[in-house]
């Protein structure tokens, strides 16, 4: 049981900086301004369900996609590292705030004409939460843990769905309490936390690239 908690904790530490619910909260506040409370709650729930589904598909079907297109693990790690590092750089040095982006503005204009517009899948679930960096991380991690003997087989079966479920629950809770979060930490606080997460993502991306290169060198020797 202790191994299960360790695996879940490790998974959350890896995924949460990539999923970054706080940036999704900032985007949600910009897009859902014209929605009533019930509609905001519905969008929050649907976004969380979509995120869970995307992560499950990436974990269990990602290897099949890799085999179909002939993608190697080192190649995936290097590509995932580049994506993660790029996302981290954008979070460290943002050009536009999420709520001021053209996508958010156009979505806000839609909401003025159609208050019940669906923003749960795009952009809240994808690409804001379960974006390319998150998906690459999940596929790479799935391939790694299946080859590793660190955890028992039953832990590797039970932990991933629980990790994805907890990420979805954290996102749902964050979106449900989006107004309170913004009032508590303020825009400056969210920006500071986002930049810290961006730095962590850059470090993780560089480590991904290093691991991929080392694996290529080891394979060719």
Curated annotation (Swiss-Prot):
Membrane topology recorded in Swiss-Prot or TrEMBL: Multi-pass membrane protein
Question: May I have one GO cellular component term?
Answer: plasma membrane
Its name, as the record gives it, is: UPF0056 inner membrane protein MarC
- For this UniProt entry, which residues form the secretion signal? none
UniProt keyword annotations, A-Z: Cell inner membrane, Cell membrane, Membrane, Transmembrane, Transmembrane helix
Cytoplasmic face of the membrane: 29-44, 90-118, 176-196
Query: What residue ranges are annotated as transmembrane?
Result: 8-28, 45-65, 69-89, 119-139, 155-175, 197-217
What is the organism of origin for this protein? Answer: Escherichia coli O157:H7
PANTHER family found in the cross-reference section:
UPF0056 INNER MEMBRANE PROTEIN MARC, UPF0056 MEMBRANE PROTEIN YHCE
Write down the Pfam families for this protein, in alphabetical order: MarC
Gene designation: marC
Q: Which family does it belong to?
A: Belongs to the UPF0056 (MarC) family.
Periplasmic side of the membrane: what ranges?
Answer: 1-7, 66-68, 140-154, 218-221
Q: Which NCBIfam families match?
A: NAAT family transporter, PRK10995.1
Q: Which InterPro entries match?
A: Multi_antbiot-R_MarC (IPR002771)
